[in-house]
Amino acid sequence: LEPNRTQPRQSFDDGAMTELADSIAQHGVLQPILVRPLLSGGYQIVAGERRWRASRMAGLTTVPAVIRDLTDSEVMQLALIENLQREDLKPLEEANGYKMLMDNFEFTQEEIAKTVGKSRPAITNALRLLNLPEDMQNMLEHGEMTAGHARTLLSFKNEDQMKAAARRVTMELSLI
């Protein structure tokens, strides 16, 4: 059994994982993970990597699973939908998931919106975050600014103005 290297979620909160592992140790896995068979043998996790990781942390050697034959496009869609419905993806994880659907499977923003149950403007706003300079993406990733603040920064004409505004935002947030 192997994780999906293209799954949208890239970080797993240690505290949340410990809580999930404790719950699984006490109650078991309440919902099976979704996997697909691999041509090379074995299976790939499509949905449920957090449950799988937490099960391993809890000492389980097996996890209930549903097996489905899925295309790469279906895997990406289901992984993104499942993550959006569970513990929130970080804003950049969500944006990168949408970008992968567009780049790898030629989805339009409208098709993504229908697939994940969001409005097209919500998809557009998420994707805009990928236009932030790398240092500001890091600030967003580490919770030093909100996605709303980050989108506001994109309205500045140049990167110097953006960076000055970002410093003000992070100072204000650290005072709260």
Give, region by region, the residue ranges found by the protein language model:
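General structural signal for secondary-structure boundaries
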Residues: 1, 71-72, 174-176
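Short, charged/polar connector segments at secondary-structure boundaries
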Residues: 1-68
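Amphipathic, charge-rich alpha-helical segments that serve as recognition/docking helices
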Residues: 5, 9-10, 25, 53-128
